[in-house]
Regions:
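Glycine-rich, proline-tolerant flexible connector loops at the mouths of alpha/beta enzymes
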Residues: 40-64, 111-116, 170-183
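Short beta-strand segments at enzyme active-site cores
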Residues: 5, 39-49, 76-84, 106, ...
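Alpha-helix-loop-beta-strand connector modules within alpha/beta enzyme cores
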Residues: 54-82, 123-142, 183-204
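Active-site beta-loop-alpha junctions enriched in small/polar residues
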Residues: 8, 47-49, 83-89, 109-111, ...
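Catalytic cores of alpha/beta
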Residues: 87-100, 192, 201-203
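Conserved anion-binding
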Residues: 91-172
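Single conserved hydrophobic/aromatic residue that forms the stacking wall/gate
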Residues: 1-11
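Glycine-rich anion/phosphate-binding loops
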Residues: 17-30, 84-91
Length: 204
């Protein structure tokens, strides 16, 4: 996919430990360093909010997340993505709409994954319906066999990838390793590429 490199930065929503202004300052420092390093895109996520809620973040987190993104100074040439952990696609789209971000990352868009937050079922229909009400064009980057999770027995990564594009409305399929920072399985990547030869893929 044309993005040379995408890096993730995290947002913490714990005012008893760090103020919102401090979060913004730290986030801006991350942005500056990433841009200096030559990235084309940045994913902003609430990585510090462990243990994560499964799929419905608090209104406070939604408001703080939006405020942080709105207050970042980022060159217009840099694509901005929103990922609301663990799997709140509606919130991600809402933040992206409000902040004019380019895309969202959704960890489980369709099918079912067994995660450290329990069983997560994709909500591609609800997300598609909500996306259709938005004014801005926002791409959906969707994980296939997302990290820190396992699929149902008998599932095949290539079938899940095809369904993400053909049935769930994903614009880009993300192939990852088993956990944060783990390398991907090249055999899995090859299977995904073969099943969606014209589809857009990202590795992360």
């Amino acid at each position: 996919y044309p993005l040379r490199r995408q890096r993730q930065m995290c947002i913490r929503d714990r005012s008893n430990r760090i103020s919102l202004d401090e979060i913004i300052d730290h986030a801006q420092e991350d942005v500056n360093n990433l841009i200096f390093g030559g990235v084309d895109g940045i994913i902003i996520e609430n990585f510090g909010d462990t243990p994560f809620v499964k799929d419905d973040i608090s209104k406070r987190t939604l408001a703080n997340f939006t405020t942080v993104v709105e207050n970042l100074s980022i060159d217009k040439d840099i694509k901005i993505g929103i990922n609301v952990l663990r799997n709140d696609g509606i919130a991600a789209l809402s933040i992206a709409e409000a902040t004019k971000s380019n895309f969202v990352r959704i960890n489980v868009l369709n099918n079912t994954m067994f995660t450290d937050q329990g069983v997560i079922e994709g909500k591609s229909h609800e997300i598609s319906q909500f996306k259709s009400t938005l004014n801005n064009v926002i791409e959906i980057y969707a994980d296939v066999f997302v990290k820190h999770a396992v699929p149902a027995p008998g599932s095949k990564i290539e079938n899940h990838a095809a369904e993400l594009i053909e049935r769930a409305g994903a614009d880009v399929v993300i192939v990852t390793g088993d956990g944060t920072g783990h390398e991907i399985n090249l055999n899995d990547l090859e299977k995904v590429r073969n099943i969606v030869p014209e589809g857009k893929l990202a590795i992360g």
